[in-house]
Design a protein with these regions (language model features):
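N-terminal "mature head" segments of proteins
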Residues: 2-171, 485-493
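Repeated scaffold domains used in trafficking and secretory/extracellular systems
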Residues: 89-103, 130-142, 165-177, 207-243, ...
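Short loop/turn segments that connect beta-strands within the blades of beta-propeller domains
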Residues: 102, 111-112, 139-140, 147-150, ...
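Residue position within the beta-strands of beta-propeller blades
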Residues: 108, 145-146, 180-181, 244-247, ...
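Structural motif
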Residues: 112-117, 149-155, 185-193, 250-256, ...
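Short loop/turn segments that connect beta-strands within beta-propeller blades
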Residues: 119-122, 155-159, 194-198, 259-261, ...
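A structural motif specific to WD40 beta-propellers
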Residues: 126, 161-163, 200-203, 263-266, ...
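Loop/turn-rich, solvent-exposed surfaces of beta-rich toroidal or solenoidal domains
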Residues: 374-454
Length: 493
């Protein structure tokens, strides 16, 4: 009886102080008490050796039943058990890219210039690439594009057909048509090449020797930086070759090119002498639309005093144009048919954010008046052209439309005081939040890792882990590449 009483005391103290040692001691003491009780109950009915064996067996069974299941139930998850693919850990300076296609492969570019293609179907595929090569995925994720010394090599995902090599630097890949720019003896030309019949170009037009490239989508850039962007700078930064070909003419400015004919589409997108940023982005998400609109070309031009004017085009025609923003020192991000500017307004030192979108001509704070009535934010996990993801004082992770402030979805956190770490990218949220210890055998330092499809808040992967995570890289399709010091794993999808 004394042993059983001690077991009860240990169980109570362990539950109160959340001490695992006391909880285990309670199970062992309960087993010992049960064995002693059986020994006393049997008395002299059996031989001594038999009585001892039965009592010891009961003690072992009771102790195991009270400890082993409890220990197993609180063991943290292992990343590799939920992994779609496992590869070497990510290091500083290594890039991870995914195409907007939801389940396309993931391109990993290592610091030494080597590269890997990762997918659920083929696992980890090592790519032959020199450090100076530019590697990118097509916008639909079905092809890999490799540029070496002005030679473009296009490989179909899965190796269904032989790679196609085309002389020149790629500007875009629209379906099966690759638009390239090649120069020889001071003469430059643009060509459209059907990858199904690459021997003869579909069309060829002359191009100026002086040119520049568009800007990377979703990347924060100085608004008034007059430095010319290289033809492949955006492709190298995003790891994706766009499907809309954009051409810079030093006499006219920026033009959109029809990949089927090589002719300019619509009006001049931005004048040659203006300080403008330009990129082709997906259209803003519209849940009410029966069919998603095609890509849009965004421009944002800076005036002499730093005021910004943003314009959205579709097929060379203006969809909307913003009014001038307040003058100031701004960086801009072109993403999902909207322009997000961060910086300081002239005459102030406080940094803020303003947004230009299809909603109205005036620049406004992200979320507009739609988030004015929302509960106070405690942290922001990320923002892009479509949504911003925040945490609030009620212990929730909430997504709002970046332009309208409309509530999109909500997920719970473990507690309002939980420390939260994570990020938003490629329409995916990766969040790591602390878990409160509620049971004595819960390990210390547990955190819950969730990969969330930012489009609708669907959790595509969820683990409770005690591992030290060094990198959280969100990817398209509700996936993420998570790295520790020992390995990196692809989760979600």
């Amino acid at each position: 009886m004394v042993l059983l009483a001690l077991a009860g005391i240990c169980a109570l103290l362990g539950a109160h102080f959340l001490l695992g040692a006391l909880r285990l001691a309670a199970g062992l003491l309960a087993g010992a008490g049960a064995g002693a009780f059986l020994l006393a109950l049997l008395g002299g009915r059996l031989r001594r050796r038999m009585r001892v064996l039965l009592a010891a067996g009961l003690a072992l069974v009771v102790a195991a039943a009270l400890t082993v299941p409890a220990v197993l139930a609180t063991r943290p998850d292992r990343l590799e058990r939920a992994a779609i693919a496992t590869l070497a850990p990510l290091r500083e300076g290594e890039a991870v890219h995914s195409a907007p296609d939801e389940q396309g492969p993931v391109l990993v570019r290592r610091a030494d210039g080597t590269a890997q293609l990762v997918s659920a179907e083929s696992g980890v595929e090592e790519l032959e690439a020199a450090p100076e090569d530019v590697l990118a995925l097509s916008a639909d994720g079905t092809r890999l594009v490799q540029v070496t010394d002005e030679l473009t090599r296009v490989s179909e995902r899965g190796g269904g057909s032989a790679p196609v090599e085309v002389p020149g630097t790629p500007l875009a890949l629209a379906g099966d048509v690759l638009v390239v720019r090649a120069c020889e003896a001071g003469t430059c030309r643009l060509s459209g090449v059907d990858l199904g019949a690459p021997d003869q170009p579909l069309w060829t037009v002359s191009d100026a020797e002086q040119t520049r490239g568009p800007d990377p989508v979703g990347t924060e850039l100085p608004a008034g930086d007059g430095a010319a962007t290289g033809l492949l700078d955006a492709v190298a930064a995003t790891g994706v070759l766009p499907e809309v070909p954009l051409r810079f003419d030093p006499d006219q400015g920026w033009l959109q090119v029809d990949p089927a004919t090589g002719f300019a589409v619509g009006r001049v997108l931005a004048p040659a002498d203006a300080e403008c940023r330009i990129a082709a982005t997906p259209a803003p998400s519209d849940p009410q639309a029966l069919q998603q609109r095609g890509p849009q070309v965004l421009t944002v031009c800076a005036g002499e005093d730093g005021e910004l004017t943003a314009t959205a085009h579709e097929d060379g025609q203006v969809l909307w144009e913003s009014a001038s923003s307040p003058a100031g020192d701004w960086t801009v991000r072109l993403d999902a048919g909207r322009v997000l500017a961060t910086g300081t307004e002239e005459g102030t030192t406080t940094e803020g954010e303003i947004l230009a979108s299809e909603r109205q001509s005036a620049w406004e704070a992200p979320g507009g008046q739609g988030v004015d009535q929302a509960e106070a934010f405690t942290a922001r996990l990320g923002i892009d052209g479509t949504r911003m993801v925040v945490t609030n004082a009620s212990g929730q992770m909430v997504a709002y439309d970046t332009a309208t402030g409309a509530h999109l979805w909500t997920l719970p956190l473990d507690s309002p005081d939980a420390e939260v770490r994570g990020g938003l990218g490629a329409s995916t949220v990766v969040v790591l939040d602390e878990i409160r210890r509620e049971h004595p055998l819960d390990p210390r330092g547990l955190r819950r890792l969730r990969v969330v499809d930012a489009a609708d808040g669907t959790v595509t992967a969820e683990l409770v882990t005690a591992e030290e995570l060094t990198e959280l890289r969100p990817l398209s399709g509700g996936r993420a590449l998570i790295s520790t010091e020992q390995q990196a794993v692809l989760l979600g999808g």
